[in-house]
Amino acid sequence: MNGVIIGRFMPPHRGHQYLVEFAHNFVDDLYVLVCTLSAEPIPGELRYRWMQELFPRDHIIHITEEIPEASRGAPNAEQIWAQSVREAVQEPIHHVFASETYGSPLAEALGATFVPVDPAREIFPVSASLIRQDPYTHWSYIPEPVRPYFTRRVAVVTGSEALRPAPRLLAKHFDTVFVNDYRRFLRA
């Protein structure tokens, strides 16, 4: 049996990981379509690479074709998406996995069974848009390979002894690492 997941994964998060892992354990072959547009804030090629790194056992397919007539709510959008999915996968599709409402009509258009996975987001109460709005509040939902994209580096340059603890305190506050005062190494 084959399964399909489609999404933007902008960025991938723990909810996406749960969805993919659930689907992976449900089918023999899983196809994950990473659908990207050139104008999106996180580059599509980067999201595609993240998904490949996160799910090396699955078939990760990058869809870059812009299909404006298939936007949500557009007439026949499911049929248009179903055709794109068939072209990308080229294998029989038995199951469509999603946590969002588009999954059911897409599955119907593909002649597949819809498997809703955590549609109320009770297991992982997060969305990619929430992460884009405030990544640090939702840091625990961002997978390790994705975190560097949101990581900001700060350099504290001072001659003041009073500010020596600042890097350590900043690191503690932002739950990250810091480099100790480099002057100690220069004096050695």
Q: Predicted segment positions?
A:
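Glycine-rich phosphate-binding P-loop
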Residues: V154-K172
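Conserved substrate/cofactor phosphate-moiety recognition/catalytic segment
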Residues: R168-A188
